[in-house]
A protein has these predicted regions:
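Helix-loop-helix "sensor" segment of P-loop NTPases
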Residues: 12, 185-238, 259-262
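P-loop NTPase nucleotide-binding core
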Residues: 17-25, 29, 33-145, 173-175
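C-terminal helical "lid" of AAA+/P-loop NTPase domains
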Residues: 233-239, 245-260, 299-302, 315, ...
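Conserved nucleotide-binding/hydrolysis micro-motifs of P-loop NTPases
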Residues: 22, 28, 55-59, 152, ...
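Amphipathic helix/helix-loop-helix segment enriched in hydrophobic residues with interspersed Lys/Arg
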Residues: 133, 247, 258-274
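Sensor-1/coupling segment of RecA-like P-loop NTPase cores
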Residues: 137-139, 143-146, 152-160, 164-194
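C-terminal leucine-rich, beta-strand-based interaction scaffolds used for sensing/assembly
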Residues: 231, 268-383
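Pre-Walker A adenine-sensing motif
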Residues: 2-14
Length: 383
């Protein structure tokens, strides 16, 4: 995957437009790590790179304008940029004043601006991207935005981003996006723009298997002089299901309990760390997400865990909760909005966090819905 991404970067640097890329998968599969690794590949390339993390307290348009200022400033030193600088800067001023009025870096009156933005984010972001793309083309640069947690973008923002990328592709401009997010981003992109599937390469990031899983365990230990027996490796891969974050946490728990002089890790060392491994996951990785749910939402996810298999249908969840589908549909929507679950197909849902149903079983072994309130209060499985 990293090698393919490097080819995409090399190709766009040579002036050939590239499809943007969306990496999607469950929590803990290494999407952000991959995105960061691709970013590092741009260090020695003529690529202007911006990392955008979508979060409640981090404004998308503000992050776009901040990076755009840096990109335009850097390109402005090129002799070939002189015919573009004033026009692109003027467009950026208009965009900034409209969408980020609290930004005081551009104190400019309407009469001083050549460009007046429309107030339609899709049109205005497209104008900005096209202007920067043309400037990059003339100055020998490519522009790449890396967007993490892309599923949290508002639909209006995603529609604008897709429209801007689409226009840049039509004009064969060297500007592309690498995005990473949960599986629900596929449905969102299809919803906002029907042609999204032509604009993006969608690459699923899943659990590691075979040699990749072994490498994730063995290679970090090599600089420390450590090694694993084959039996220990098999046990770790089985216990973690190959999920990179789980491998990291289990190996960390193993190393914490090793004798300082020990270099070979065996099956007993792995077994001795398993309890600590699950305690760490339950108190952090899982609990952080569980605590964001309301009591009713918790009943919903416990009912999901009680289904015979996952993904499960919402009708099955309703049956377990002894209610109608219409009564629990709002909880489904809320949980999807919180990125706790996602729709895997027609009327089917699953958790976005690997093995989340097993965590719920550790909290409430019998998965009794009438016990959820006790779990909520910490009477079962807390700390």
């Amino acid at each position: 995957t990293l090698e393919r991404a490097e080819k995409y970067l090399n190709t766009i640097v040579l002036g050939y437009p590239q499809q943007s890329v969306i990496y999607y998968g469950l929590r803990g599969v290494g999407k952000t790590v991959l995105l960061n690794a691709i970013e590092c590949k741009t260090d020695d390339m003529p690529i202007l790179m911006g990392h955008i993390e979508i979060a409640e307290k981090r404004n998308f348009t503000q992050q776009i304008t901040n990076y755009s200022k840096k990109f335009i400033h850097k390109m402005s030193f090129k002799e070939t940029a002189k015919d573009f600088v004033s026009r692109v800067q003027d467009l950026l001023k208009a965009f900034t004043v409209t969408y980020n009025p609290e930004d005081q870096s551009f104190k400019v009156g309407m009469e001083e601006r050549e460009y007046i933005v429309t107030g339609d984010l899709s049109e205005d972001l497209t104008d900005l991207f096209v202007a920067m793309g043309k400037m990059a083309d003339k100055t020998g640069y490519a522009i790449c935005f890396f967007v993490d947690e892309i599923q949290y973008m508002k639909e209006e923002e995603i529609a604008a981003l897709v429209n801007a990328i689409h226009r840049c592709n039509q004009l064969r401009l060297p500007l592309m996006i690498f995005g990473a997010g949960l599986p629900k981003i596929l449905k969102t992109l299809g919803k906002v723009k029907s042609y999204s599937e032509r604009l993006f390469r969608f690459e699923e990031i899943d659990a590691l298997s075979g040699q990749d899983a072994k490498d994730a365990i063995v290679k970090p230990a090599e600089p420390l002089g450590g090694s694993y027996t084959e039996e220990a490796l098999r046990w770790i891969i089985s216990e973690t299901q190959g999920y990179p974050y789980f491998i990291q946490e289990l190996c960390s728990a193993i190393w914490e309990h090793l004798n300082p002089e020990q270099t070979v890790i065996g099956i007993d060392d792995v077994k001795g760390a398993v309890l600590k491994f699950y305690e760490n996951l339950d108190r952090g990785f899982y609990r952080l997400r569980y605590d964001r749910c309301t009591p009713k939402e918790k009943m919903f996810i416990f009912a999901m865990a009680k289904c015979e298999k996952l993904p499960c249908s919402i009708s099955n969840v309703a049956k377990i909760m002894e209610t109608e589908v219409s009564s629990i549909s709002p909880y489904r929507a809320q949980l999807i909005n919180k990125s706790m679950i996602y729709a895997t197909g027609y009327a089917e849902i699953d958790f976005t966090v690997p093995e989340f149903d097993q965590f719920l079983k550790r909290l409430n072994p019998e998965l009794q819905l009438d016990e959820v309130e006790k779990v909520q209060k910490g009477d079962a499985g807390d700390e």
